[in-house]
């Protein structure tokens, strides 16, 4: 089989090479880009990329180079675009620093450059492009919207916390309220994440904390007393990232692309996700990181949300050799989006709606796409698969900005599917295979990784180090986030889990949490997830729960090593190594537990009368 694969690679290489026999090189310094401090490179970059795009042809490769340096970009003169981006606030228009659009066979090489952005911007976008590589640069913002402070004193007797504001944070105390400020924005933080000052781990059993930003007394510049802030867990030296819940734009945005590689890119901050890819095919991340600037970086945080996020993509997603740390959500999230059925027009036509306020306005499906239908209360499939023969936006001229689509199907839709009982439509065409390997995930909020795709998913050779919540989540939800779908082929092998689950967040029932949202589990007769193998991993943990699973047909846990420590007190409500709800065809064999394994003590099975 390897010889066949190698032959296919050689054939593809020869075809691609013959199609792109001419190489054109463009040095962006010739277009006026300058690494001089306070020089705005946004207009020159926009002009350069537009001129280069016009020269893209099928039979040539374009290499665009940026001489190594520190380049600044300001929003006022940047390219302006209307983008509807999955899982982000739909704030438009957006100011884009590097708008790559309509590119073919293009390599952008930053040669180690630092790209520094001001205000609120979308740093890099790649749209409607094919066979493109972005590599060798970093993304950061001059004034992040997250305000970092350090606890100097905590009066646990009388109450009140005194904190020091990091030197790069612009702020004022306005009518005794902390107001963070930047170019074109200001906000008062509403929540915070607490980090241990010496280790950078999230503080044990804190999760999202309220922050004392009102009724303040400024003792001296950058030294502030908050008399009402009472939290004994925040000892002096604790570093707190005070934040809002806004996420206007990611660091990198991919849309309608085919065959994209992101290589040796570091995102140090973005107000949304590090990378958001939607409706794109075949994406490779190699050395793409959302990370600090090394061990001496005074910052403790990176992105406001997920490090990487893939919504309604297809082909292969490969993510390897990355470092993900300090972000406020998952290192990777792969899913599609259910449309909720809001009207049955006739027996072959339905109207479906995007339901989450951060997920609408982008293309959902195309003629010929295969779909299936699901009952949201039980998450069971209803009727047979079908195929789209026509799709149009209902509330907009086209899909841009649309929330509702009228969809005509090839065959009659099951008569039980209508607007009254909660049904979702899942697009099966836009579902990828996933390889997530050789990554380091550490010191982040929420979860380490999240996968919701029916195609093969392999998670291997990763280190999940103090991910604070669940390390791996297999989800599926047609009720809140409306993120598809069922996992049918998952292999989790040769990973190392170090003290995950020091905090509680959504869906964090164990280190590996298989947690579809099923409101009426008691009425479910089928199973949502299937064929999940957890093999040859090492778990180093202070607490009990290893695997939680709900509605699974086929779960294997073999050849794993479990080591117990006392680095934190056990606190999780789940006291079982394995907690199964409606799980059949499960196997737990050939594992090593340094404290032993007793099935009656370590396994809880709730199957509602179904056989195990």
Swiss-Prot record:
- Note whether rRNA-binding occurs among the keywords: no
Q: Which GO terms describe its cellular component?
A: plasma membrane
Record-listed E.C. numbers: 3.2.1.n1, 3.2.1.n2, 3.2.1.22
Q: Identify where the record puts lipid attachment of type N-palmitoyl cysteine.
A: 20
The UniProt keyword set, sorted, is:
Cell membrane, Glycosidase, Hydrolase, Lipoprotein, Membrane, Palmitate, Repeat, Signal
Q: What is this protein called?
A: Alpha-1,3-galactosidase B
Gene3D superfamilies named in the record? Single-stranded right-handed beta-helix, Pectin lyase-like
Residues bearing a lipid moiety (S-diacylglycerol cysteine): 20
Protein's job: Alpha-galactosidase. Removes both branched alpha-1,3-linked galactose residues of blood group B antigens and linear alpha-1,3-linked galactose structures.
What SUPFAM superfamilies does UniProt report for this protein, alphabetically?
Pectin lyase-like
Signal peptide coordinates: 1-19
Q: Where are the PbH1 repeats?
A: 431-453, 454-476, 487-536
Quote the catalytic activity from the record.
Answer: Hydrolysis of terminal, non-reducing branched (1->3)-alpha-D-galactosidic residues, producing free D-galactose; Hydrolysis of terminal, non-reducing linear (1->3)-alpha-D-galactosidic residues, producing free D-galactose; Hydrolysis of terminal, non-reducing alpha-D-galactose residues in alpha-D-galactosides, including galactose oligosaccharides, galactomannans and galactolipids
Show the InterPro entries listed in the entry: Beta-barrel_GLAA-B_II, Pectin_lyas_fold, Pectin_lyase_fold/virulence
Q: Can you tell me where the transmembrane regions are?
A: none
For this chain, the family text in UniProt reads: Belongs to the glycosyl hydrolase 110 family. B subfamily.
Compartment(s) where it occurs, according to its Swiss-Prot or TrEMBL record = Cell membrane
């Amino acid at each position: 089989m390897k010889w066949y694969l190698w032959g296919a690679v050689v054939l593809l290489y020869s075809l691609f090479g013959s199609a792109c026999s001419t190489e054109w090189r463009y040095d962006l310094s010739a277009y006026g880009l300058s690494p001089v401090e306070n020089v705005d490179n946004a207009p020159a970059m926009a002009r350069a990329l537009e001129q280069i795009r016009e020269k893209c042809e099928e039979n040539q490769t374009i290499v665009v180079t940026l001489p190594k340096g520190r380049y600044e970009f300001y929003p006022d003169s940047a390219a302006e675009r209307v983008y509807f981006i999955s899982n982000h606030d739909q704030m438009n228009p957006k100011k884009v620093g590097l708008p790559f659009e309509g590119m073919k066979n293009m390599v952008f090489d930053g040669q180690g450059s630092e790209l520094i952005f001001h205000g609120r911007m979308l740093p890099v976008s790649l749209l409607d492009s094919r066979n493109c590589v972005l590599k060798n640069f970093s993304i950061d913002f001059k004034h992040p919207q997250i305000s970092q402070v350090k606890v100097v004193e905590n009066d646990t007797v009388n109450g009140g916390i005194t904190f020091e504001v990091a030197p790069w944070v612009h702020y004022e105390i306005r009518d005794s309220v902390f107001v963070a400020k930047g170019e074109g924005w200001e906000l008062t933080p509403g929540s915070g994440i607490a980090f241990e000052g010496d280790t950078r781990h999230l503080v044990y059993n804190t999760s999202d904390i309220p922050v004392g930003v009102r009724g303040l007394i400024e003792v001296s510049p950058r030294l502030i007393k908050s008399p009402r802030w009472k939290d004994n867990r925040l000892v002096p030296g604790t570093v707190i990232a005070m934040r809002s819940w806004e996420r206007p734009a990611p660091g990198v945005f991919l849309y309608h692309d085919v065959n994209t590689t992101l290589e040796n890119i570091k995102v140090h901050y973005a107000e949304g996700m590090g990378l958001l890819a939607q409706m794109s095919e075949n994406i490779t991340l190699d050395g793409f990181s959302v990370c600090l600037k090394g061990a001496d970086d005074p910052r403790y945080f990176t992105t406001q949300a997920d490090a990487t996020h893939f919504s309604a993509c297809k082909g292969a997603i490969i993510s390897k050799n990355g470092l993900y740390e300090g972000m406020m959500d998952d290192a990777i999230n792969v899913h599609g989006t259910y449309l909720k059925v809001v009207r049955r027009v006739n027996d072959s036509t339905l109207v479906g709606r995007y339901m989450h306020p951060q997920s609408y306005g982008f293309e959902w499906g195309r003629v010929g796409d295969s779909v299936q239908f699901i009952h949201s209360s039980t998450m069971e499939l209803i009727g047979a698969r079908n195929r789209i023969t026509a799709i149009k936006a209902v509330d907009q001229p086209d899909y841009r900005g649309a929330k509702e689509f009228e969809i005509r199907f090839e065959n009659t839709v099951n008569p039980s599917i209508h607007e009254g009982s909660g049904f979702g439509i899942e697009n099966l065409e836009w579902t990828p295979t996933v390889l997530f390997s050789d990554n380091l995930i550490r010191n982040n909020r929420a979860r380490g990784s999240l996968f919701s795709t029916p195609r093969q998913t392999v998670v291997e050779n990763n280190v999940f180090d103090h991910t604070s919540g669940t390390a791996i989540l297999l989800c599926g939800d047609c009720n809140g986030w409306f993120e598809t779908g069922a996992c049918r082929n998952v292999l989790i092998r040769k990973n190392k889990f170090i003290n995950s689950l020091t905090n509680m967040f959504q869906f964090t029932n164990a280190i590996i949490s298989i947690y579809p949202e099923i409101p009426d589990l008691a009425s479910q007769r089928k199973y949502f997830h299937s064929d999940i193998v957890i093999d040859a991993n090492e778990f180093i943990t202070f607490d009990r729960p290893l695997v939680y699973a709900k509605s699974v047909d086929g779960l294997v846990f073999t050849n794993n090593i479990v080591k117990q420590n006392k680095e934190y007190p056990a606190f999780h409500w789940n006291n079982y190594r394995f907690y199964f709800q409606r799980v059949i065809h499960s196997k737990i064999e050939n594992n090593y537990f340094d404290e032993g394994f007793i099935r009656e003590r370590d396994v809880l099975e709730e199957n509602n009368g179904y056989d195990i």
